[in-house]
């Protein structure tokens, strides 16, 4: 959730990835969505996301963090490992947080003023049962309004806690 709120605050678009994706599905999504920064964890069940990422981005093992140049994925620049382990070419969570100190409050405010509630904040991919998965773009307003409408349907009041 931290990455979701942080990306929303700076106007970045968070692309959610199905944790059951196999190698070819992840590669399709990264290429289709023009991913700039990929945030990964160890993996789930039988998926090793670190290994999948190195397979997808072999240049990562010899790249400086933040300076990835991939022939296959030209928009990809950064990989962040969610955790404290260090992996070649990737920022870990602590290093990412330190990068926040390089941006002044003034620059952050300028960035925040560049977008509004009708800008895309999240892209979710369909299951792809009838073809390749398609990215569905959701705005800040879409997500907020969805929560509001659900609250209305469930007859929530200001006294309720969710």
Kindly label every feature range from the protein language model:
Residues 148-152:
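Generic structural signal for well-ordered alpha-helical scaffold segments
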Residues 10-98:
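Structural core segment of the AMP-binding/adenylate-forming
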Residues 112-115, 121-145:
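Conserved AMP-binding A3 loop
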Residues 84-124:
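Extended low-complexity acidic/polar segments
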Residues 32, 73, 114-117, 156:
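Alpha-helix termination/capping residues and helix-transition junctions
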Residues 1-5:
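Cytochrome P450 catalytic-core helices
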